[in-house]
Amino acid sequence: MLSRLAQASRLGLMTARLSQPVASPSLRAIPATAPHFASPWLRSYSKRSSGQPPKESKKKPSQAQNDAEAAKTPEKPAENDVNKASEQSPEAPKEGEQIPFHKLPDLTQGIPSTLFEEMGGDKKKEQQALQELEEAESKGNERDRSEYVSTSERNRKWWTRFMLTAVAAGGTLSLLYMGRNWEDTIEAERHSDSPNGPSPSLWWKRAKARMTESVTYYQEPAFEKLLPDPDPTFERPYTLCLSLDDLLIHSEWTREHGWRIAKRPGVDYFIRYLSQYYELVLFTTTPYATGEPVMRKLDPFRLILWPLYREATKFEDGEIVKDLSYLNRDLSKVIIIDTKAKHVRNQPDNAIILDPWKGDKDDKNLVNLIPFLEYIHTMQYSDVRKVIKSFDGKDIPTEFARREAIARKEFQAKQLTHKHKHGSGVGALGNMLGLKPSNMNMMVSPDGEQNPAEAFAQGKMLQDVARERGQRNYMELEKQIRENGEKWLKEEAAMMEAAQKEAMNSMMGSFGGWFGGNNPPEKKA
């Protein structure tokens, strides 16, 4: 409190001196900022920037008050402060130099303010303090940038460790669970190489077997046997597998028409003619949902006995493969016709690869293959793979027609010299084709047909007799389809509707049993 009074008295003395008329050069030399250096608690008004002389103050301090304050405060310290301030100020005039009146501060309106200078000084001090602090930290506590780890980086590392630990724990528990003993005797018999037991090796074998099964479920065909066991009464010893896309049909999409499907020329004749010789199987990579509606239109009378879709194929090395070993048929009597060699890479000796059909309406490649397939059935070869191998690298229809023409020429020449030997026609045909027939199923003629001996005497070959019989059977089938085709389709639709109703009734009966209802009454026979 006393210090404030002392400062106030000192201020009053300085104010009184400055308010008096100019009398002393020493007082004129006092700069305008002297009160600021004399006391940090003083605030005054700033100087006028204009050169106009200040107006007279309306309120003048009394002389008695100035004298009283001057008596209380010694004059010498104030003069020392003023001298110090004049030395510190760079703009202060030299000693003895008179200051112009318009440059003096206007004290009639009060003491000039030093607020802006104080605030500017405080900011400079703060900035200087911050710079000093940063320099001190950089020098004293300096560390490498690589040692700094942000919060997000720490969180990421924590979650990474947590996830790795969880995965390791889950994998260990899964391995222990999958390595348990087999639950029934059927599984134990199916995995005889990994029997039950507590040893770690057997545990690992069982876990490996279960993991392999879980993966092969999506890679292997839906069933181990895609076709039922062959019927002994079914008089078709050979199986012919046909692809769908670009072999029997061609599908394309356009902006104008959307999806359109074209049927290959001669497909109906090809299917109906060979159905008397082969067990026809559709083996395609098209899914069931897409291929089944197409097959209903393509083969409404079900001459293709077994349709196999994408679900029956095998996924191997990133590609879809048609594995014939799952057909439940003797591979020596299986032929597959496809447009892509990679689809039949597991059994290439059983495959006939044709060029993809792209919609050409004059195409005859499929129909031209009928004589070769008919000849295989006629000669009853024990292994069709050897026959197909003999045409390796050649166009089968063209090469077969060439061999048949040579055989016919030789046969006719021998017929002229050996008319009494009718069996020579069969031997000449097989020898010229480079094939040896194992059984001649055409030697016994049905009722109403020409005897083979008579046919040979007329210059006909065995293959000619087989074609005549095949054409008669085909014409009979066409007649049956024309007369009874609609009836067959209606009967099939009625059977399907009855099966659907039966399935619906069975399902509703099951629901009634679950919810406590009565079972539907059984129909009396």
From Swiss-Prot:
It is a single-pass membrane protein. Residues 180-525 are mitochondrial intermembrane. CDD domains: HAD_FCP1-like. Residues 233-376 form the FCP1 homology domain. The chain crosses the membrane at residues 162-179. It is found in: Mitochondrion inner membrane. Keywords: Membrane, Mitochondrion, Mitochondrion inner membrane, Protein transport, Transit peptide, Translocation, Transmembrane, Transmembrane helix, Transport. GO terms for biological process: protein transport. Residues 46-161 are mitochondrial matrix. One of its GO terms (cellular component) is mitochondrial inner membrane. InterPro entries: FCP1_dom, HAD-like_sf, HAD_sf, TIM50. It comes from the Eukaryota. Residues 69-84, 136-147 have a biased composition (Basic and acidic residues). Residues 35-150 are annotated as: Disordered. SUPFAM superfamilies: HAD-like. Residues 1-45 form a transit peptide. Pfam families: NIF. Component of the TIM23 complex, at least composed of TIM23, TIM17, TIM50 and TIM21. Interacts with preproteins in transit. Essential component of the TIM23 complex, a complex that mediates the translocation of transit peptide-containing proteins across the mitochondrial inner membrane. Required to direct preproteins in transit and direct them to the channel protein TIM23, and possibly facilitates transfer of the translocating proteins from the TOM complex to the TIM23 complex. This is Mitochondrial import inner membrane translocase subunit TIM50. It comes from Gibberella zeae (strain ATCC MYA-4620 / CBS 123657 / FGSC 9075 / NRRL 31084 / PH-1). The lineage of its organism: Eukaryota, Fungi, Dikarya, Ascomycota, Pezizomycotina. The gene is TIM50.
